[in-house]
């Protein structure tokens, strides 16, 4: 759908009584408000509606608060999680005075990135395919205050419940630590919930390729087909929305938090990327791994800027509890053919059209409307400056002796380190005005003040075990 008349007709055909207007905030959370379908006029669909931008995190001040949401008519769908038939549309944010797209609207950053790619002449399309893992729990509790803090997670799949008394009796079949990859029923207890998620995605026009249990107990993955950067980012938001709501409908709770469970694998968002021009794949060639020279330079840019990229691809303090040795997390900045211990993997493919690179460091805590463009900008910088990625690492990097391992560059070990890296390395993001200095500065300030310092200033329960009797 591309015209207001088509959208209004679609609403009538589906008996919609409400219109839900969704938009992404600066940190990556969907916000929304809903209007009766009678308010959905052609004028409203073309011009948008006003709202208070000062009430959204990281946006306007109260003395300059008026903002406008403008529907992107190509994103119209029926939302399956409302009792009353509700049409949903993703919106862009504009300044109502100038009519210009708002610089801190993350979706605007993605749109500018796609335009910048075309302007370089390098390619006309970038395809992105994220693989986002998540956990499903039966019970989650947490609290934090001056008097104490705790968290508690639970799933009937988890091994600590092997001795628990359960309603109707404990039937065993728990999943041990790091033994959850591809188990069949009855170990895979939430298989039907995943299937419901997939069917819901398909009903909404999302092409799903596969779904399965992941390595950790209660951990899962559903893979949808790659698409252009903006459409893939939009699908990622629907993906999270569907997973969370189907989980709630089935008495579960879903999280995309990178590391909710100590001593087991965390959740990543491995991101496949390829550039095309005039319908031809530019990453296919006769170099290492079947890649083109351009693709190798793209990898060089990713690896060079990876510490700064981490500020967007791994933007949570919790992200760095996943990026530690021993849990299949790619902390070593190297590339390789088929090798999952490297930060960049070159998957085996059947044809040149499938030739791509997979960046394995990101996690789903990322705001994909910022993370996808940041990765592309790093890769393009590699192409523009012919950055050599070095020699591939065709060994299990985790097994290298310390003297060799220490020569390989590493991902940051904390969000603070990632922010410092971004502070000193962000010029590549400013090309084409894709990221503005304001966006980078605001991101740095928010993450440091509201997250890094907030975590650093609070006692941790494990500190009591270590230090109470000091």
Where is each model-derived feature located?
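Glycine-rich, acidic/polar active-site loops that bind/position phosphate-bearing ligands
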Residues: 1-470
